């Protein structure tokens, strides 16, 4: 093990939540350590239980994809919603997607629309595409093709500017 990993481990053993989270990320990506899904899950779950917002959102992803743990869409939804409730704005769009497709929760296009709109209102670029689709198909709202095309154009414009 290298010195950076040992330093992070020492802080984690002392209860430093950011270090605990860091160990989870280290194990997930093989940074300073070998990749290890189970250890990544262990430390991300521990950080999440200590209130680390990004860890809570990551735990939702782990449960959704069965990363280091048995796949469980209901637990994934629980942690995604918890991340949003605790202020993790980056988790809002994904919560909308879970409502739209009934992932871990009963399908609810109205709530999906609500969360996509909320995500767009705070500047989430990906949410523009989902919200456009809602307006196009009338999911959770009255169909509005003009609004859908406007949002789709804005999404394409923002993606183009991000990639240049």
PLM regions with names:
Residues 1-30:
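N-terminal segments that cap or nucleate solenoid repeat domains
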Residues 13, 31-35, 49, 65-71, ...:
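Short coil/turn and helix-start
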Residues 129, 133-137, 142-160:
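TPR/TPR-like (Sel1-like) alpha-helical repeat modules
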């Amino acid at each position: 093990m290298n010195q950076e990993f040992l330093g992070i481990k020492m802080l984690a053993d002392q209860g430093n939540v950011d270090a605990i989270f860091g160990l989870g990320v280290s194990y997930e990506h093989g940074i300073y350590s070998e990749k290890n899904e189970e250890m990544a899950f262990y430390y991300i779950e521990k950080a999440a239980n200590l209130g680390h917002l990004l860890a809570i959102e990551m735990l939702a992803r782990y449960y959704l994809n069965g990363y280091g743990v048995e796949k469980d869409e209901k637990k994934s939804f629980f942690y995604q919603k918890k991340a949003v409730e605790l202020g993790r704005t980056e988790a809002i769009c994904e919560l909308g997607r879970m409502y739209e497709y009934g992932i871990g929760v009963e399908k609810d296009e109205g709530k999906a629309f609500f969360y996509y709109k909320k995500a767009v209102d705070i500047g989430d670029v990906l949410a523009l595409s989902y919200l456009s689709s809602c307006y196009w198909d009338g999911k959770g709202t009255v169909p509005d093709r003009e609004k859908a095309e406007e949002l789709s154009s804005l999404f394409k414009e923002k993606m183009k500017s991000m990639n240049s």
